[in-house]
């Protein structure tokens, strides 16, 4: 689909640029894995078509709930695709005090399904805002959410305790996962108790 756009553009002008997005605009967590999946083909086709000007957006829709620095993994990935191949693990550690793989853990509160890197979803947001007494018939709550969120909180806890100016990112995601380990299934538990 990207090549078709460039073919159309070339009929109109020789001067064009590319604007892509680092996904952080649908909830509290970034979507670095989805950004990587969606930007790889886009950047490859842009480079093949000789695009020189490239812009990366990180919109703050819905109150800019996800932290601006939570997309550092996306920025490093896109940098590597675009112009500089470097060891992402080491560079991320030098830059933030966290390895690249550790930074990708910021996505965890929205990763409840095996396919989440393919479709951006925001269960952490809708589960947090769900009224546990009224429920929401469009929200499907699974019993295993409690287990997922407990596991996520356990993974995020030591990362939140590291000495780094970016540790607040992990504290926020840990606290969100920890809270959701209780709240995500509370409506089911209340219903069953009733």
Each predicted region: which residue ranges?
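Substrate-binding groove of N-acetylhexosamine-processing glycoside hydrolases
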Residues: 1-194
């Amino acid at each position: 689909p990207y090549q078709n756009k460039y073919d159309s553009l070339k009929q109109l002008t020789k001067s064009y640029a590319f604007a892509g997005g680092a996904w952080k605009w649908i909830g509290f967590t970034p979507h670095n894995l989805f950004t990587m999946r969606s930007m790889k083909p886009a950047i490859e086709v842009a480079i093949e078509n000789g695009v020189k000007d490239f812009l990366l957006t990180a919109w703050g829709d819905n109150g800019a709930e996800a932290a601006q620095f939570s997309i550092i993994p996306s920025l490093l990935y896109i940098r590597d695709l675009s112009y500089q191949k470097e060891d992402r693990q080491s560079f991320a550690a030098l830059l933030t005090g966290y390895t690249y793989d550790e930074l990708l853990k910021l996505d965890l509160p929205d990763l409840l399904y095996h396919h989440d890197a393919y479709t951006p979803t925001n269960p952490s947001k809708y589960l947090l805002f769900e009224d546990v007494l009224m429920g929401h018939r469009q929200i499907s709550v699974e019993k295993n959410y409690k287990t997922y969120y407990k596991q996520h909180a356990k993974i995020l806890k030591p990362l939140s305790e590291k000495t780094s100016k970016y540790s607040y990112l992990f504290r926020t995601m840990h606290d969100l996962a920890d809270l959701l380990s209780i709240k995500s299934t509370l409506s089911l538990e209340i219903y069953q108790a009733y």
